[in-house]
């Protein structure tokens, strides 16, 4: 990865890969540091590279510049390093079964396809990356027949909508996720 890239470049590391990238840029960090403070290190990677960062994990974190950010005028106004100009999106839809060989390649393919369909000027790489992460996780949930998620909504006292039992589902391989992509799109668009 070059020293600095435009925000339309999306990197999709897991904790170990992000730690390696950051270490190569002079940060003293390892995979456990990234797992313990994923938002901090995703923000740091975005700051150091300029790339949109999609940090894969039980809860996927996407960090990048919104499409309406104008770096040049922001820098003149003193906002170049202002965190309010960074978009953070979190997706926890994926089941644990998604942690399988080749699943990251499926995500990269989905992400590339979605980015390729965007206007160059209006693309919000963080939004597109978050959309890809959600679709990827949802397709995996469908393929594994699982209700698992990276986070669970809180149980509200007195509510009938309790999340005490979830279907664990079954193991999947990357091609199972690929097979569910058309049905996932169809369901979400219906």
Annotate the PLM regions:
Residues 96-98:
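Glycine-rich phosphate/pyrophosphate-binding beta-alpha loops
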Residues 20-23, 100-135:
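Short, small-residue alpha-helix embedded
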Residues 65-66, 85, 90-91, 107-123, ...:
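C-terminal amphipathic "assembly/sorting" segment characterized by alternating charged
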Residues 1-92, 186:
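Glycine-rich phosphate/dinucleotide-binding loop and adjoining beta-alpha-beta core of small-molecule
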Residues 13-15, 55-57, 64, 92-93, ...:
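Active-site proximal loops enriched in glycine and acidic residues that flank catalytic Cys/His/Asp
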Residues 138-190:
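Charged C-terminal helix
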Residues 38-46, 122-140, 174-182:
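Short, well-structured alpha-helical segments that form the helix of a local strand-helix-strand
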Residues 27-38, 119-130, 148, 152-159, ...:
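Short, charged, surface-exposed loops that flank catalytic or proteolytic processing sites
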């Amino acid at each position: 990865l070059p020293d600095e890239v435009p925000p339309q470049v999306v990197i999709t590391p897991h904790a170990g890969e992000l730690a390696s990238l950051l270490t190569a840029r002079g940060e003293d960090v390892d995979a456990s540091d990234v797992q313990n403070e994923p938002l901090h290190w995703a923000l740091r990677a975005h700051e150091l590279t300029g790339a949109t960062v999609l940090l894969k994990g039980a809860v996927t974190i996407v960090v990048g510049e919104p499409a309406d950010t104008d770096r040049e005028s922001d820098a003149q106004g003193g906002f170049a390093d202002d965190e309010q100009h960074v978009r953070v999106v979190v997706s926890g839809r994926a089941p644990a079964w998604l942690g399988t060989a080749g699943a990251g390649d499926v995500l990269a393919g989905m992400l590339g396809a979605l980015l390729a369909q965007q206007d160059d000027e209006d693309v919000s790489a963080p939004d597109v990356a978050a959309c890809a992460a959600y679709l990827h996780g949802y397709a995996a949930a469908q393929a594994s027949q699982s209700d698992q998620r990276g986070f669970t909504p809180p149980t509200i006292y007195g509510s009938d909508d309790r999340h005490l039992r979830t279907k664990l589902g079954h193991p999947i391989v990357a091609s199972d996720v690929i097979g569910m992509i058309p049905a996932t799109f169809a369901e979400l668009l219906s």
